[in-house]
From Swiss-Prot:
One GO CC annotation: cytosol
HAMAP family: Phosphopentomut
Binding-site residues for Mn(2+) 2, renumbered to this chain: 297, 302, 350
Protein's cellular compartments: Cytoplasm
Role noted for this protein: Isomerase that catalyzes the conversion of deoxy-ribose 1-phosphate (dRib-1-P) and ribose 1-phosphate (Rib-1-P) to deoxy-ribose 5-phosphate (dRib-5-P) and ribose 5-phosphate (Rib-5-P), respectively.
Gene symbol of the encoding locus: deoB
Organism: Colwellia psychrerythraea (strain 34H / ATCC BAA-681) (Vibrio psychroerythus)
Origin superkingdom: Bacteria
Protein name: Phosphopentomutase
Catalytic activity: 2-deoxy-alpha-D-ribose 1-phosphate = 2-deoxy-D-ribose 5-phosphate; alpha-D-ribose 1-phosphate = D-ribose 5-phosphate
Amino acid sequence: MARAIIIVIDSLGIGYSPDAVDFGDVGANTFANLARAYYEETGKEIFLPNLSALGMIKACEQASNQTFPYQGQEPSKGAYGFAQEISTGKDTPSGHWEMAGVPVLFDWGYFTDKNSSFPTSLIDDINRETGFDGILGNCHASGTEILTRLGQEHIETGLPICYTSADSVFQIAAHEEHFGLDNLYKYCETVRELLGDLNIGRVIARPFVGDSADNFARTGNRRDYSVLPPAPTVLDKISQEGTHVISVGKIADIFAHQGIDEKTKATGLNALFDATLDHINTAQDNSLIFTNLVNFDQDFGHRRDAIGYAKELEALDVRIPELFHAMSAEDVLFLTADHGCDPTWPGTEHTREYVPIIAYHHQIDSVNLGNRKTFADLGQSVAELFNVEAMDYGTSFLSEIYSK
């Protein structure tokens, strides 16, 4: 029976969507804008021969009605299209849950105040339950900036650094040695329980190391504590029917470990890619391998590093043929994204954009999937592939990728 591989190139948006005006994101285009910035800075065109052959660049051109400097080729061996998000937010859980067939049609809770962001009553509850005398931060911040600003005070006082953003998150940074990784995880678990009716999507543990503001750096031991999806995702449905669902990276955390049978953690593009290849080489028939390449978002999108983002895409492109070589005749590969995070855009937050929908198997020719009305088309296609009950949202494109 077939195996499927889903790889999420985290934050690779391909052009602002029609509702971007509601998010202040009209003009955002993660892919095109980073490619332009790369060309302007280096004088080089981004070199993506393998992703372009799959239709990634063509999908961006169709979604945004614009082009950009690149070296590549016309689509020749993959189905390509672009999908619009119908979920109310542009956050990680919303994007992933929607691509798994369950869009988020309710409003998340947010901490909207830029300073003194958390309710006093919540902070009091956290201090009482954890035994700490207070918190540092209590504001909107980027993860790197707040470590530079408060990392030393955290080491000296022992107080956790708590901060948020435009997303529905409560983030907690703590030093792995001075605070302790297990203590950080326990603290996050307590906060998750105390958030209660505030409807906050995720509590995120952000461990770091270093001995001064000059070298504080996050580690790969991040952990996300998500609420449950509002309905069974396609992962739940196929797992219940016997498909072996494998998470690589932070997928299991995003889905609150629901519908996941096996988990592999890894840090960095190459380690995540290697773990994915290992599973392709060893996974049984009737398996789904689901990988999130988080570094595109956290290392380059949020940090507004267009040049680094472009180089990382080139590094990914070099490795794409390894997927083809590892895949069996029955396997199908999907490449997509969960939202945008334009590294040329003001601020540090996600951007509301179309995402690519790319599909590949060994017998496929080039197929234009066009404009998909929801990320859930991917989940519906996976449901059909594994012959389980249809999802409530989305239109399968499975017949289109096997029609030629």
